[in-house]
Amino acid sequence: MTAKVIKWPALLLGFGVAISLSTGIFSAQNANIGTESGLDRAMQQNAAKRLDIGPGKKVNKAEEGAYKALLAAQNGDPATRIQLGEDFAAKFPTSLYLPGVYGVLTSSYFVMGDTDKMFSAGSKAIQLGPENVDVMSLLAMAIPRRVKATTPDGAQRLQTAEAYAHRTIEIIPTMTKPAKADDAEFEKAKNDKLALAHSGLGMIDMARQKYDDARTELTQAVQLASSPDPVDYYLLGTADVQGSYYKDAVAAYEKCADSGPLAAQCKARAESAKHDAESKVGR
């Protein structure tokens, strides 16, 4: 397969279906997006590295200045980035920088918890570039968690979320490391995006009650992530219990219980899984 140098990776826009989860999980994910995440910062840094739009393509000074102002806000308040990004898109609707602007807006709306606008920004990002693994991997994870099961056209939206994940997994191995990029950081970034894709697939499998498949996907998610998501450990433990892998469930719940807003719930579930391991026939 021919390696690709991804300049403006993109995503496939769509929605997903959330399985019935406890309030604790939704509280946990909202806690994670309430402040800027490592993924969010990485996306802004990627945008900064792509400031050069290529030889022979002219940009006026006002446009370039507005884009630089957006990138300068990359480590600050996401609400500020949103204002700068929306202003840029309104003022320069045909800008060559728009793929990056909509990528920044997608991640910024994610950390602000604005699901609808996150989807809208992502839709525009994919229209401008179909291989944006930054945005695609983010939505592959977020969509199945953030859209309720009562959403209209739920089955279709679930399929779309699944497509994001598979496309991410397909593209990332073909990416060529930029010449000045650190090898370890490049691998870390790729693995973190793959982890998001596998997390999304695991959640989708949970919704379909395919618990063995969910175990496979969620195990990959926690193994690939540089900082595994406690929600993935929670879901993995739940899939383990459903498949009668009680000892594995104990291990997953104990990882989930190490920290975060799900800690108390995971401790209780770990104790329950221990009881199941002693009293039931497991695998």
Stretches found by the model and what they are:
Residues 178-180, 191-207, 242-283:
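Terminal, low-structured helical/coil segments at or just beyond the last alpha-helical repeat
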